[in-house]
Amino acid sequence: MQQSHQAGYANAADRESGIPAAVLDGIKAVAKEKNATLMFRLVNPHSTSLIAEGVATKGLGVHAKSSDWGLQAGYIPVNPNLSKLFGRAPEVIARADNDVNSSLAHGHTAVDLTLSKERLDYLRQAGLVTGMADGVVASNHAGYEQFEFRVKETSDGRYAVQYRRKGGDDFEAVKVIGNAAGIPLTADIDMFAIMPHLSNFRDSARSSVTSGDSVTDYLARTRRAASEATGGLDRERIDLLWKIARAGARSAVGTEARRQFRYDGDMNIGVITDFELEVRNALNRRAHAVGAQDVVQHGTEQNNPFPEADEKIFVVSATGESQMLTRGQLKEYIGQQRGEGYVFYENRAYGVAGKSLFDDGLGAAPGVPGGRSKSSPDVLETVPASPGLRRPSLGAVERQDSGYDSLDGVGSRSFSLGEVSDMAAVEAAELEMTRQVLHAGARQDDAEPGVSGASAHWGQRALQGAQAVAAAQRLVHAIALMTQFGRAGSTNTPQEAASLSAAVFGLGEASSAVAETVSGFFRGSSRWAGGFGVAGGAMALGGGIAAAVGAGMSLTDDAPAGQKAAAGAEIALQLTGGTVELASSIALALAAARGVTSGLQVAGASAGAAAGALAAALSPMEIYGLVQQSHYADQLDKLAQESSAYGYEGDALLAQLYRDKTAAEGAVAGVSAVLSTVGAAVSIAAAASVVGAPVAVVTSLLTGALNGILRGVQQPIIEKLANDYARKIDELGGPQAYFEKNLQARHEQLANSDGLRKMLADLQAGWNASSVIGVQTTEISKSALELAAITGNADNLKSADVFVDRFIQGERVAGQPVVLDVAAGGIDIASRKGERPALTFITPLAAPGEEQRRRTKTGKSEFTTFVEIVGKQDRWRIRDGAADTTIDLAKVVSQLVDANGVLKHSIKLEVIGGDGDDVVLANASRIHYDGGAGTNTVSYAALGRQDSITVSADGERFNVRKQLNNANVYREGVATQKTAYGKRTENVQYRHVELARVGQLVEVDTLEHVQHIIGGAGNDSITGNAHDNFLAGGAGDDRLDGGAGNDTLVGGEGHNTVVGGAGDDVFLQDLGVWSNQLDGGAGVDTVKYNVHQPSEERLERMGDTGIHADLQKGTVEKWPALNLFSVDHVKNIENLHGSSLNDSIAGDDRDNELWGDDGNDTIHGRGGDDILRGGLGLDTLYGEDGNDIFLQDDETVSDDIDGGAGLDTVDYSAMIHAGKIVAPHEYGFGIEADLSEGWVRKAARRGMDYYDSVRSVENVIGTSMKDVLIGDAQANTLMGQGGDDTVRGGDGDDLLFGGDGNDMLYGDAGNDTLYGGLGDDTLEGGAGNDWFGQTPAREHDVLRGGAGVDTVDYSQAGAHAGVATGRIGLGILADLGAGRVDKLGEAGSSAYDTVSGIENVVGTELADRITGDAQANVLRGAGGADVLAGGEGDDVLLGGDGDDQLSGDAGRDRLYGEAGDDWFFQDAANAGNLLDGGDGNDTVDFSGPGRGLDAGAKGVFLSLGKGFASLMDEPETSNVLRHIENAVGSVRDDVLIGDAGANVLNGLAGNDVLSGGAGDDVLLGDEGSDLLSGDAGNDDLFGGQGDDTYLFGAGYGHDTIYESGGGHDTIRINAGADQLWFARQGNDLEIRILGTDDALTVHDWYRDADHRVEAIHAANQAIDPAGIEKLVEAMAQYPDPGAAAAAPPAARVPDTLMQSLAVNWR
């Protein structure tokens, strides 16, 4: 959003203003709406994007400075060194620090700064950061010390900002000033001025002027004079009217005019008029609509006592046009606007020296364009004032006296309401105006002709007296008012009290006027009694009227009839008593004027007083109140019947208290009425007798005193009652426990209600849950609060609590379903794997935290109990177990507000999932959900059509931005219940949850490990991640993007844009009237229109034509017959499923899957290898190009199928299954298909004639029943599936499958492949080289090869072979000569195949034994350790994997060992064979009996190096050897020669010659006198039995002889005796040839004699073991000469060694 505010500017002035474009559009709209020109100061450019992003703005209460550098640019740092003041003097920083502390002490907060990714990008582009490496950002503040900043990503996708001075050690968080809700602040948009049009106030001001007033006369005269002088609405008249409107004292200008120009004072909004407040609020509402917070916080510079000046001002006219004006241009512009009827009033501070920016009030001053300075234009407008009026202080601003000097002769000085900064000063000004008018009237009276100076003086005294009387009357009326509101049973509200106060005040004014008139009438008389008597009568009438008004306020439309009657009687009685008293007073006054005696005066006064006393004593409203109080007690008794059943007795206790209270108050009222009545009667009687007037006075005083005493003790009496009942509560366990029973009872009452049980049972069924966990927040009852208030216990209770129950089918069951921690905000669901619980909130879940209460005296007889929630209030954490849980968050409190309804903070929900597949039903609250393991779903379906969500994927996390418009959210606040107990009032606060409409609300959810997201009814945007997501838009115009993964996307109702992204995606579309954009993206994607069945009503209205889809054109027309122009545009879609109606579907040149579903559909595959499925109905299917598959599943209709080009298949496998055909096994017949005739009969032999017409179709797949499938001359694939099928291939190379059942397969002509499948099958290959695919199951199959070379293949056996017998690892036993194949690994089993005419066999992956016959066989072992025997004939044997044994037997055979260590058994006399070992360590073996080596036969001559083997001296018997490593000879005299590899040569019996050749060989002579030569390499030589000879010489390497005794063995070394060095190495004898690296070791020579040879020959000399031992001893005396030493010259050999050599070598 950082860049979005730059888009949409209409001109350069708009962009220069720094106001975000979207906000500016709202400003222009408000200017038009209010018909006013709006002027603004330029906005800090670094705050522009923050305002657009939704950051809150500061009011006047924040004096700290913002920052213009670094990552904190645009914000207000708590550390002044990070602000724009960085580098300033220490005292400047200290003052700034004080400003920060002051802001934090007055409702603001210190917030850790976090930035969005877009904000970081903006800061880089703006050059405020110089780079980033490893999360550290360098930021230079020019000319000062460098700071380093670090950003760290937080869990909600933002970046926390930390800082340190360069080179410092630890980073710390950058803190900025935020509002009370914790939202960081940036600069607001300052209004410079507002110029409303005169029409905004002219008419209202004119209509509200009061007639008869000297000020009004002045207004009228000046208006007429201005009109006559100008003849129109020129500037002078506008200025004049504006001055009058600004003067606007309440005595002269009406309410509507004051609405435009009244002032208020507030530390955050400053001095602001109501009109300015309306404009400000309208601007902020517009800002909210585009996602911003309040953007304008306070009034204009016109009201600022310390205004600032700007080089430029941004102006928006009332027509919405905008421009940027310099100070010089502003003067001309304001003049033009004034001429058009727009009003501009100027700030007095502008006229102070050093602050003037204008010549003659509006002039030009130099400055830097666009800069903001410390003063701005100002000219003070004034109105007349009286001398000595105290003006509110303007600080250093000097006072100016200017303006008009007179107002009808009133005053000679001017004062300015523009200087007034609070309401108290306004009231003072109005009183001063009133006083001036009165004095003006007095002076005018003094000047009247015919009135003497003494009379004028008396009149002045009378006026003063009248004013004194009026003041006294106000006091009396106030007493009457308190009396009225103090009566028992009074139910007046504070609003009613305010209205009554106004009425009494007006009555006092009227009484004052009467008193003044009477006094004036008797002007010149010295008698005061008449005037004051009338005044007393007027006071009595005022009291009566006050009481009558109090009663009249209860006459509402919904008041009970009894209350209306009592009020009517009260009004009549009070007005009658007051009128009588006033009449007697007037009569008294007239009598006094005529000189009546003072006794008559007293009598009159007594009679009037008696009438008033009687009226006061008989109060119908008081009687009605006592009766109603008694009825209320009866109602409480009814409540108590139910609450007592659940353990709460408080309602019964409160009922009894009210009965006791009624009795006490009734007694007091009765005695009072008797006293008043007796006193009134005595007074009237005494007054009638005249002479008894003194008695009447005394009686009235006495009864009045007694009544006063009686009424005075009434309140203590009922307070004692309250204390008695408080003690009862203490005795019953104390107030805390007592009132908790009320919460428990209310919980039990709801939990056991039939309505709740039914609702929860329905929820359980709808959610497919095993149980429902109900969480209930219960508020205390109003009656319980009332009882607590009366007994003084309102601070000793909880007003709300949370309860949890588990329900199954609506019935409450035992067990603790969750662990609940209200104080910490924790809900842990105790669930196990396999369960499906559901969590729902029966009543809205209140905020977490604990309740603290305190009772405080807030008035004379008023107490208020305050409640505060403390502890963790901003989050509920819900933990799920291992079950598949549904969590319904629809009724959760989203916001916490204070007692004034001001938002404190939002409440976040944190949901931690477990191992199951969970579903979370979200609401307006901000949630963080971690789904954990399983497939998890979050649904926003509860959101309304006006709301929307935007879901973005961030790796494994989703961020969900919820835009809620006109949102209803549950919010918890503090409500107050007022209880009047006599004259005591108790205001009790309690926790209260309500569903509130909050207008616009934006919340961001974070979701992790969530796969499925469901949108709401609004216009949503949902983007998936790399997993396989299920995304549903719901109603509204949605945008879905699956991203990577195989996603399922549901657009729902509305005009949707759906993008699949990477992966194989599925689009589920409704057959609605909306047009959608569908883009499959990469992968193989499918769109389905068969999700919802249209209703009968829709079908009746819209017909049965479904869609016209063409993937090549990229369009899907819905309801085309109605021309609704409802078209989905599709691209990158490979597969399409139609609707349940009659569809027309065409694919494209890709491989499509096209389904018609129900209805009579027409489908064209076009190019590609397509899958076409008509579904139910009469369908026409065209495969066209490509190898197509037709899926048939409706046996009750006849379809038309044309395969077109390619190899096409019609598949009936899905047609017959449970539910498709009534009693499907009744006959057991499936289909009958004959491709040569072009038809397929469905439900064959059942008397039904449903045929599919098939053309250009090569392949058929049958049903699970008994099918007959016949091919044609083409190469067909025919698959029988289940049932006893008959399958005939016909001509061509066919592929036939029998499937399950006892099938008959006939290959007929051609090279066919036949698979019988399970069941006892008969397979006949017919002509051609056929292939029989078999499995070693328990069935008995018959295989007849027929003509040609045929093969039976058991390679698909897998691990099934041999399982039944327990001989795991054994495969088949096949003997083609015997015509039998045992399939369970042993001969004679019941599971065998009968084979005939079969030449070749392929074994299993296990250990098979396969024997050929006299024919030329191909036997393949496949996997396992197989034994293959070719028998007669020229055979081919292939061992395959495993260590196989191969024997070609007779014939010229080819044997291939392939992988594994294979063993070839070969007859040396059988020539012409090829033995190829393949991979592994392979051996050819001539040792076996019957190998052609009889008594007269010769041995084997074999050379692995040359690759042949034959009989000795008979090369014509040669066989070819390849890849053979080892050889085993015969029992004759053999010659075995190795190759360059590591060979094992075993001579067996006979006198053999073994030559290893190169490589590390192993030679085994075995029996006989053998000759062993290891040759090159390190060889091991085993002579075995017999007289063996070992050859060794130079170049032979390191050979080892292993002797085991027996025979006379000899070592022959090709070297001279003097070239040999003998040494003992452990038990071994080592013989080395000097000058070489060759050595011969005789293993275990020193162990015993059996391991020694009898002689060693070197050249012509020999040595025996004894001589060898002597040489070893002799040579041990000399250093080992090493490999490079040559034979020592005789001259150098010591004599002793020479003697030893000569003696031992002979």
Swiss-Prot record:
Region A, catalytic: start and end of each range? 1-399
What Pfam families has UniProt attached to this entry?
A: Anthrax_toxA, HCBP_related, HemolysinCabind, RTX
Spell out the residue ranges that the record assigns to Hemolysin-type calcium-binding repeats.
1014-1031, 1032-1049, 1050-1067, 1155-1172, 1173-1190, 1279-1296, 1297-1314, 1315-1332, 1335-1352, 1411-1428, 1429-1446, 1447-1464, 1468-1484, 1537-1554, 1555-1572, 1573-1590, 1603-1620
Residues of the region (Disordered) are 367-405
- Which residues lie within the region annotated Required for interaction with CyaC? 500-698
Q: What is its biological role?
A: Bifunctional adenylate cyclase toxin-hemolysin that plays a crucial role in host colonization. It causes whooping cough by acting on mammalian cells by elevating cAMP-concentration and thus disrupts normal cell function.
Specify the protein name: Bifunctional hemolysin/adenylate cyclase
